[in-house]
A protein has these predicted regions:
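Short, compositionally biased
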Residues: 20-37
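Conformationally flexible catalytic loops at phosphate/diphosphate-handling active centers
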Residues: 1-2
Length: 200
């Protein structure tokens, strides 16, 4: 056998489970051949429509390519983990006032709007079901010391203050806790921003 280390490339055949050393050339999946023919027959008689889970314009375009007839669930929280967005959502979470939260959300709104526009374009008029921010806020706050220090510095707070905020977000059962519509009740400015981004 061989020992792999962090940063080493390996490839896995999803059908057989076989592992290959290094990055091997791949081809994009397609619906063709005998499978495509059988699916075409099924399309002639089916009444059920197939929708996809897609959270980005790229995922939506891929889903349409494979025949999805809409998006059954677009999870907006996945949009917040990319690039500069996570910094803005963390600032929003650690803000002391509605005005500070709205300032952070103003950074996120055009990004969300752009994502929704891309998704709508990719879906070519097919229905899209969008779920507003759902997970508990503790999922967005930093856990690494360096990230906590950076957030404290960016917000003009002490590390202790940020750690207190993070500790305050901990829940015994986050699956049943402060999330989803409960978040919208506590922080209506989040739902307002997302509503504007969806509609614009």
């Amino acid at each position: 056998g061989k020992t792999f280390h962090e940063g080493d490339w390996l490839s896995i055949d999803g059908s057989t489970g076989k592992i290959y050393d290094g990055a091997i050339p791949t081809v994009d999946a397609s619906i063709g051949g005998e499978f495509g023919r059988v699916m075409g027959w099924a399309d002639q008689y089916r009444r059920l429509k197939v929708r996809t889970n897609a959270d980005t314009p790229h995922d939506a375009a891929q889903a349409r390519k494979f025949g999805a007839e809409g998006i059954g669930l677009c999870r907006t929280e996945h949009m917040f983990f990319e690039g500069d967005r996570i910094a803005a959502i963390r600032e929003m979470i650690c803000s002391d006032t509605v005005e500070q939260r709205e300032a952070a959300l103003a950074i996120l709104e055009p990004m969300q709007q752009s994502d929704f526009e891309g998704i709508y374009e990719a879906m070519e008029g097919c229905p899209v079901t969008i779920r507003f921010l759902d997970p508990p806020l503790h999922e967005f706050v930093p856990t690494e010391e360096a990230d906590i220090e950076k957030l404290a510095s960016d917000m003009g707070k002490t590390v202790a203050e940020i750690k207190n905020i993070i500790a305050g977000l901990h829940e015994f059962n986050p699956m049943m806790g402060h999330r989803g519509c409960r978040l919208a009740v506590t922080y209506p400015e989040i739902a307002a921003m997302q509503t504007r981004a969806v509609i614009k």
